[in-house]
Amino acid sequence: NLANTYTGGTILNGGTLTIGADGALGTEGDIIFNGGTLAYADSAAGEDATGYDISSRVNVGDGGFLNVSVLGAGDTVSWAGLSADVMGAGTTLTKTGAGTLALGYAGNTLAHLTVEEGTLSFMGGATIGVNPNNATIVRVSEGASLALSGGTVNLHAQLNGAGTVTIGTADTAGLVNISNTGNTNFTGRLELVGNGVNMSTNANWVAFGAGNTLGGGTVFIDGKGFHFSAGTTAANFEIGAT
């Protein structure tokens, strides 16, 4: 838990490695994920590692697995330096733990994305899945949340699960594009948030790919300037603002 003289690097082959203090894995060298889970301890337990951003040192091979847990329900861990340069093609990202993991990462090399617990957020827009391949599966479990905020959000993936997916923020407008090659088996809550400041140039487009369906969850719209095109939906709609 305590910062130490260990400088790195680190190879995680299996099990769970829990860090409880800033600097616990040193400040140099790659942190290589060959399996297992990296967990941030609950900050309420004593030492606090939530400000310990090791993302620029993460190394995941092609087809690898990046499993991250933030254990504290009120904790937020921000990884600003995660990039395609350190994420192998076809990486599977899994988020567990009751806290929030905030990523500054476009996400376009992900094969699969799973939010089992807590919240996973992508800051400054995101592209998840590569169009037209559309082989990516995004699953958000019941009680968990995926937040995609700011700029352009492209979700070229099959969306599954019963959790909450929030796209946009109250003070920004952007483009939301949801497309996949098959039906979206999502029974949770899809929240579309934005203000459409200039509808002529910054309208919040929500494009469901032609021939695709959105499952029987709830679509909550809180904002203005949203336009729907193509596709079908079996979802219930709630309008929070006009």
Model-derived segments and spans:
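Surface-exposed loop/turn positions within long extracellular repeat scaffolds
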Residues: 1-62, 76, 80-88, 100-162, ...
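Polar, low-complexity export/assembly segments characteristic of proteins
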Residues: 66-68
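Extracellular beta-rich ligand/substrate-recognition surface
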Residues: 71-75
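Active-site and glycan-interaction determinants of carbohydrate-active enzymes
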Residues: 92
